Curated annotation (Swiss-Prot):
Pfam families membership: ESX-1_EspG (PF14011)
Disulfide bonds: none
Keyword vocabulary terms for this entry: Chaperone, Cytoplasm
Protein's UniProt name: ESX-2 secretion-associated protein EspG2
Keyword Chaperone: yes
One GO cellular component term: cytoplasm
Family the entry assigns: Belongs to the EspG family.
Keyword Membrane: no
Subunit: Interacts specifically with ESX-2-dependent PE/PPE proteins.
Species this protein is from: Mycobacterium tuberculosis (strain CDC 1551 / Oshkosh)
Length: 276
């Protein structure tokens, strides 16, 4: 694992010639004509990168770091994970796959972490790898003893404006006392931690988004005092629903795989290769 700053990652990009990593993380852009390797190596953070072995004394990047950056540059598919905790600054992470290699890039404020996640050549292996990385980012927690709840997403958006209207809406759905309490906690960002996952596919999106297609649904992992809850966006017919269920590892893994399968790559998500 390499831990550095946003500027440190910029230096590594300039030295390796990797023009783009994960724009969804809001990182410092690299301007190839201006941000040369020579200019980057004059940045004070270059000395820190040399001290940890990411750069050698000649200013060359460690081969392993170069490989990690190449996976980000040439990624075929990935997940964007946004994590929020009460009173804390959000963390964003991109879990990226190129061919059979997976790499993770995290950003928390000015700090970034770059590390390999492993390799996988089949769907079972890739699914286990992805849910393992999601669990690594979110931590391990007991599943909440929640009897599953399904709500109409459009009705929810139309009816709910604040905590009071949320409670009224949930009561109209005939939730029991435990369901009402847990769903209310999950919806309150001051009482729960949230991680939202969105799937990304490279090579098929519009030019304005660097040909990255962003999936049209999400999975959320919510940690409450009662335990972990999984929230999955589901479309049935012409209606959109939010399904809340106990956040066990297997339930989250299934929801994440269904999320990725909704990309154009479909069932080939673990082996899809983008056309350059």
């Amino acid at each position: 694992m390499l831990t550095t700053t946003v500027d440190g990652l910029w230096v590594l990009q300039a030295v390796t010639g990797v023009e783009q990593t994960c724009p969804e993380l809001g990182l410092r852009p690299l301007l190839p004509r201006l941000d040369t390797a020579e200019r980057a190596l004059r940045h004070p953070v270059a000395a820190e990168l040399m001290a940890v072995g990411a750069l050698d004394q000649a200013g060359n990047a460690d081969p392993m770091v170069r490989e990690w950056l190449t996976v980000l540059l040439r990624r075929d598919l990935g997940l964007l994970v946004t994590i929020g905790v009460p009173g804390g600054e959000p963390t964003r992470a991109a879990i990226c796959r190129f061919a059979t290699w997976w790499v993770v890039l995290e950003r928390h404020g000015n700090l970034v972490r770059l590390y390999p996640a492993g390799t996988a050549s089949d769907e079972a292996g890739a699914g286990e790898l992805v849910v393992g990385q999601v669990e690594r980012l979110c931590g391990v927690a007991e599943a909440a003893p929640l009897r599953p709840v399904t709500v109409d997403a459009d009705e929810l958006l139309h009816a709910v404006r604040d905590a009071g209207t949320l409670r009224s809406y949930l009561l109209s759905q005939r939730l029991d006392v435990d369901q009402l309490q847990m769903v209310t906690m999950a919806a309150d960002p001051t009482r729960s931690a949230h991680a939202t996952l969105v799937a990304l596919q490279a090579g098929v999106g519009p030019e304005k988004s660097a040909r990255i297609l962003v999936g049209d649904s999400t999975v959320a992992i919510v940690d409450t005092a009662a335990g972990r809850i999984c929230v999955e966006s589901v479309t049935s017919g012409q209606r959109r629903y939010q399904v809340l269920s106990p956040g066990s590892r297997s339930d989250i893994g299934g929801a994440v795989q269904r999320l990725i399968r909704r990309l154009p790559a479909g069932d080939e998500w673990y082996s899809y290769r983008r056309v350059v």
